UniProtKB/Swiss-Prot annotation:
Highest taxon above the source species: Archaea
GO cellular component labels: cytoplasm
Subunit structure as annotated in this protein's UniProt entry: Homodecamer; pentamer of dimers.
Subcellular location: Cytoplasm
InterPro entries in the record: Pantoate_hydroxy_MeTrfase, Pyrv/PenolPyrv_kinase-like_dom, Pyrv_kinase-like_dom_sf
Key word Magnesium present: yes
Descriptive protein name: 3-methyl-2-oxobutanoate hydroxymethyltransferase
Pfam families per record: Pantoate_transf
Keywords in alphabetical order: Coenzyme A biosynthesis, Cytoplasm, Magnesium, Metal-binding, Transferase
Function: Catalyzes the reversible reaction in which hydroxymethyl group from 5,10-methylenetetrahydrofolate is transferred onto alpha-ketoisovalerate to form ketopantoate.
Pathway: Cofactor biosynthesis; coenzyme A biosynthesis
Recorded family membership: Belongs to the PanB family.
Catalytic activity annotation: 3-methyl-2-oxobutanoate + (6R)-5,10-methylene-5,6,7,8-tetrahydrofolate + H2O = 2-dehydropantoate + (6S)-5,6,7,8-tetrahydrofolate
Organism, as annotated: Pyrobaculum aerophilum (strain ATCC 51768 / DSM 7523 / JCM 9630 / CIP 104966 / NBRC 100827 / IM2)
Length: 262
C-alpha cells in the first residue's frame, strides 16, 4: 500500500495531480482505491447529495459529518474539507475555530473560496498549523452576487484580479489553489505566475492538476456542467438493479432458498 499523502507532497512540477470529490465512506474508499491523489469533501454535497439549489445552505455540521465519513475510509489520499458559506467570512477568529473542527473531523487541510480579501484569514489558519487550499475564479458561494454560475476572467479587469488573488493567497501560505471556470489562457497565466500547484475545474489543461465532482463523472448528476466528462452511467446501473429487485419480490423470486434458512 502506498504511503498516505501529505500536504508537502503537493509541489510545483510534480503533477499532474488528480482530485475528485467524495462525501461518504463507500465512495471515498472506492476513489482512493482508484488512485486519486486528493479527495475534496466539497460543499457541492449540498447540490449533489442533499438536493439543494446551490451550496449556500450547507452547514458546518454537514461538513463535519461528511468529513468524518470520508476520513474513516481512506488510507492514502489527502483529504481536504470545504469551509462552508459564512464559516470564515466573519473574521479570523471564527475561521480558526471552524477550520479546527474540520481538522479534528479528519481533514488534512481546508479549502476556502475567495481572493486577496481573505488572505489575512488564510495566513491566520496557516500560522495556526492548518493547511489551506485556496479557490479563485467562479466561487459557488458567491452565486447570488454573480447572478448565476458564470465564467470569470473574460475581462482584463477580472484577469488582473485573478492574478492578484492567486499571488495574495500564495503569499498568505496556501499550499495549493483551485481555479474554477475561467478561460484556459487565464488559468495558464496564473499557473505560471505562482509557485504552488494549481488545480483546474473547468479551466483547461494548463494547471498542475484537475478536479471534478464525482457525481458528474459517474453519471449521477442530471445536468452536469459543460466542463465535466461523464465516464460512466451509474444511475442506469442502480435503476436496473432496483427494478430487478422490485420485479423479483413482486413475482416471488426473492428471497430464494440461498438467501434464508428455515
Amino acid at each position: 500500500m502506498s504511503a498516505r499523502r501529505r500536504v508537502t507532497d503537493f509541489v510545483k512540477g510534480k503533477g499532474p495531480y488528480v482530485w475528485v470529490t467524495a462525501y461518504d465512506y463507500p465512495t471515498a474508499k472506492i476513489v482512493d482505491e482508484a488512485g486519486v491523489d486528493g479527495i475534496l469533501v466539497g460543499d457541492s454535497l449540498g447540490m449533489v447529495v442533499l438536493g439543494l439549489p446551490n451550496t449556500l445552505g450547507v452547514t458546518l455540521a454537514d461538513m463535519i459529518r461528511h468529513t468524518q465519513a470520508v476520513a474513516r475510509a481512506r488510507p492514502r489520499a489527502l483529504v481536504v474539507a470545504d469551509m462552508p458559506f459564512m464559516s470564515y467570512e466573519t473574521g479570523p477568529r471564527d475561521a480558526l475555530r471552524n477550520a479546527s473542527k474540520l481538522i479534528k473531523a479528519g481533514a488534512d487541510a481546508v479549502k476556502l473560496e475567495g481572493g486577496a480579501e481573505y488572505a489575512r484569514i488564510v495566513e491566520k489558519l496557516v500560522k495556526a498549523g492548518i493547511p489551506v487550499m485556496g479557490h479563485i475564479g467562479l466561487n459557488p458561494q458567491r452565486v447570488l452576487a454573480l447572478g448565476g454560475f458564470k465564467m470569470v476572467g473574460r475581462t482584463e479587469e477580472q484577469r488582473r484580479k485573478l492574478l492578484d488573488d492567486a499571488k495574495a493567497l500564495r503569499d498568505a501560505g496556501a499550499f495549493s489553489l483551485v481555479i474554477e471556470f475561467v478561460p484556459a489562457s487565464v488559468a495558464k497565466e496564473i499557473t505560471e505566475a505562482v509557485d504552488i500547484p494549481t488545480i483546474c475545474i473547468g479551466a483547461g489543461p494548463h494547471c498542475d492538476g484537475q478536479i471534478l465532482v464525482l457525481h458528474d463523472i459517474i453519471g449521477l448528476t442530471e445536468r452536469p456542467p459543460s466542463f465535466a466528462k461523464r465516464y460512466a452511467n451509474v444511475a442506469d446501473v442502480i435503476r436496473s438493479a432496483v427494478k430487478q429487485y422490485v420485479n423479483e419480490v413482486k413475482t416471488g423470486q426473492f428471497p430464494s432458498k440461498e438467501h434464508f434458512k428455515e
